[in-house]
From Swiss-Prot:
It comes from the Eukaryota. InterPro entries: Heat_shock_70_CS. It comes from Leishmania tarentolae (Sauroleishmania tarentolae). GO terms for cellular component: mitochondrion. Belongs to the heat shock protein 70 family. This is Heat shock 70-related protein 1, mitochondrial.
Amino acid sequence: ESQKVQGDVIGVDLGTTYSCVA
C-alpha cells in the first residue's frame, strides 16, 4: 500500500497521473 501512496506522491510531484499509469 505504501508503494501506491509513493506513486501518487510522485505523480503529484511530477504534475502527471503517474499513479494512474502505474
